[in-house]
C-alpha cells in the first residue's frame, strides 16, 4: 500500500471519528486496503464498516452501536431505526445485550437470520422523527416496542430513562404498553 493510501485512510478514519460514525470506504481499493488492516490497526464491526481499533476499544457497547447506526443511516437514508437501536440513539438506557444487532423498521415480514447484523421488525414507522438527521420511531413507540420485547429487568432501565430523559409521563407509558399488549 502506498504512503498516499495510508494517509488517505488515516484522514478518512479521522473524519469518521469526528462525525461519530464508522468509516464507509469510498472505493473498492480503500475497502480492500482497510480489510488488509483488520486484525491490526482497524476493526470491521459490520461488513463494509470500519473503525480505528484504538478508538473502538475505548467505546462502550452503546457508543459502538450508535457509531454503526450513523454509518448505516448514510448508506440507507430511507431506513427508520426502531426498538433498541432507536432507544440507543435517543439516549435511553438499553441493556447492551440487545445491541448485538441493528433494529430497523420493515414493511415486509420480520427477519433475523442467524449471524445477521440487521434485525427487521414489521413495524410501521408512523410519525418517525429525525434525531441528528437519522430517522427513528417516535419516543413513545420506541419505548413501548422495547418494553414489549424484553423482561422486567431489561425494561425497567428503558422506562426509567424515558421518564427522566424524554419527559414521558409514567401513566402515558403504561397506557401505551397496555394498548399495544392487547
Question: What do these predicted regions represent?
Answer:
Residues 1-182:
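Short gly/ser-rich loop at a beta-strand->alpha-helix junction or flexible surface loop bordering the NTP-binding
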Amino acid at each position: 500500500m502506498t504512503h498516499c493510501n495510508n494517509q488517505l485512510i488515516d484522514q478518512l478514519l479521522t473524519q469518521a471519528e469526528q462525525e461519530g460514525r464508522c468509516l464507509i470506504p469510498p472505493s473498492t481499493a480503500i475497502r480492500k486496503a482497510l480489510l488488509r488492516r483488520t486484525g491490526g490497526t482497524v476493526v470491521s464491526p459490520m461488513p463494509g464498516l470500519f473503525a480505528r481499533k484504538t478508538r473502538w476499544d475505548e467505546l462502550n457497547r452503546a457508543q459502538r452501536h450508535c457509531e454503526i447506526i450513523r454509518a448505516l443511516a448514510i448508506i440507507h437514508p430511507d431506513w427508520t431505526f426502531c426498538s433498541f437501536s432507536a432507544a440507543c440513539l435517543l439516549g435511553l438506557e438499553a441493556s447492551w445485550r440487545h445491541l448485538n444487532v441493528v433494529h430497523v423498521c420493515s414493511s415486509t415480514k420480520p427477519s433475523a437470520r442467524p449471524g445477521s447484523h440487521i434485525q427487521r421488525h414489521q413495524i410501521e414507522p408512523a410519525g418517525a422523527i429525525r434525531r441528528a438527521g437519522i430517522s427513528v420511531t417516535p419516543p413513545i413507540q420506541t419505548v413501548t416496542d422495547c418494553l414489549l420485547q424484553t423482561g422486567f429487568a431489561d425494561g425497567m432501565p428503558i422506562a426509567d430513562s424515558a421518564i427522566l430523559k424524554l419527559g414521558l409521563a409514567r401513566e402515558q407509558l403504561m397506557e401505551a404498553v397496555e394498548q399495544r399488549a392487547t
